[in-house]
């Protein structure tokens, strides 16, 4: 493969990665359906906690280093493999600090020690796969990176299906299959990274990637904002589940998790938009006029997506979710309906979509620490809202506690939206569309609350479709100027 063909391409790579994410999410959804039907609700909730707990803890081992490799690797593809090896060395040293914590967690859960050990292993394997997958992307082979993700999910889902066909209800067996899929994904990523990046001159060192790679200290300092952000970001979607597990039990965690599944799938939309917008903003951050033009266009697209997402999400969940999951998650047996909880979470989805411009502006800006500050603020607010609202709800009923968990998630999404606008200095732009912003948020809240209560007030959401034409027009404007992005990439 020539150096030219190995150059990353925004358009090509984003299509491969987005497509793989969609397929992986669909396969993961099928896997969750199998788990929900194969396991008791308590076992299912325990499985979720075991995976989420170590995934959240060990994500700190990432250290933000793969992000640096993705940024600096394309400038010198021959040094990508040495850079990846250096990342593994630093992450290995960091693991020595986390090993005692992992051992303590396993020992404190003596009745579930095997499951906890498997959860820790899955998390470690996933962390180990970040560097080779990033190496593939930096070398211009996002296609193979995408295949590793899809194959991992295929293996896991097939394994779940085999166990389900054998009428297995052993949560440890399902966790073992999850680990097997993760290992296969890691091995494929390592094979691909070596095939593309590992056959060059062995004398090349990672220091040629840039000045920040001159020493371990400079690497860690340069990666620190990314490391902190990666370390705390997962808590945003998991805090409510941890608090529910503490206040109530694993049955309630399982129900809230089912409601979150479709919501998380919907978050692929803002995630894809951030990925597409970031290189555009990064290339134009020294041109304030053009920078603001991009943000304005994307903001109009976001407004146009809100009504489409609300209708699509509500329709899909209303029809398909009860078909896939057991009736106990919807008939009130566990204290609430996952469908009604999802309708409340839709408010947070809309706010997350609307936060894309300000969120990405902070990522692309000259002061990445402001982005870290935003994420810290969101996590702190999510914790405070969760402890207060879920605690108050638990004093009344299980159903109200689960509902309050959804409202806590919505509140943290609102903090992310408004905090991003303030920190990115876009409050004046916000005020220019002040009436549109306030009206949109008000109608979204009324619509989603009405959907959760199955009220005719949900029809007020149809008013949001007045935003669709401006979104379509902005999308045409953005798509009509791809040459600018190609020029930026070439430079």
Q: What is the predicted role of each segment?
A:
Residues 1-27, 192-193, 206-229, 292, ...:
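N-terminal membrane topogenesis motif
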Residues 69, 134-138, 142, 162-167, ...:
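C-terminal transmembrane helix end/exit motif
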Residues 72-87, 218, 255-376:
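Specific pore-lining/lateral-gate transmembrane helices of multi-pass inner-membrane transport
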